[in-house]
Amino acid sequence: MNLDLDKAIQEFQGILKKHPVLVVGTGASCALDPRFGMPELAKELHRTVQPGKGSDAEQWKRVLVSLDGGKGLEDALDAVTETGLKERIVKVTGAFVASVDRDWIWRVSTGEVTGPLHGLLRKLVDGLPPTNPVQHIVTPNYDMLIEHTCDALEVPWTDGFTTGSTCRLDWVGARNSMLRMTREPRGRSYQNTARLLPHVQLHKVHGSINWFQNTDETRLLRCDRMVDGPPPTGWRRAMITPGHGKLEEAGMNREWFREADDAIATASAFLIIGYGFNDVHIQKGIRKRLVDQGCSGIVVTQDWSTKIESWIRDSSDLWAVCQNPGAGKPETIVVGPGNVGAPLVCEDQELWKIVEFVKAVM
């Protein structure tokens, strides 16, 4: 493929006109604060987790050896199978992510600081079709930066929970809360018609720092006031632990993201931001759409990887915008169908940063 930047941008704009499902990984949060990333979480777990005795202690020792040996957190946590140790990891993870989120909630939600997704969400929501004004966002992130950004933009959003001080999961009720009655002309008279507001439907497929589940797993609630501090007795944060064992946990909590499965299965395109392709249970549906069904997609992320390359080779219309590895200066590579072996190199450009991508493309 004879590709230049103008042609690439035209391709991207064509994909974005399809109103893509937005997939947001931790890279988007790290653009605001690196503490949202796995390396900083690994350090916090290393410092803070106090394992129990017996197999708990043995498994945690293997995790620490792996981390000290240079393994990433996801791989290191493969050693964890004990429920008690998983709960300790969730407790520390939730408290740590909540503490970082707390540093930003006011500044981002009031617009004092412009979050990295601010411009992107503005463009996507403003471009929603009136016949289906819904922007689906799928994220494995525990933090609430997407929610804060929507608040700053005054964009209505729902994560599937009802309204209230403590909210229950009810997607039907949540969607209905996005309806507004309008008076529309019908011949010589007017008729009241229910219309959806342009809004975001947020699918938090690994749970969230403001989700809580009771110990017998019969109730799932969202409570923003309980984000800071430990959960009440008999409750724990509803978060799927990092590590590849999350596939098993996801299977046990499939109802959390059944709506995400539906959004992915019906997507006309995907815009994938700061995502590491480490979640098989989510990616299965995305890959089916991109590879088996010829759906279009764009990956915008800092790090080029063999995983991204493999997906592009197997897909008919998947593109990646990444930092040029080893360039030693601001430089972007654009890779798409037909030029995997010879990427377009954009010197003095940082289009892999979502803010710069939005400026150049949207």
Feature locations, PLM:
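Conserved catalytic-core helix/loop/strand module for nucleotide-ribose chemistry
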Residues: 1-269, 276-278, 286-362
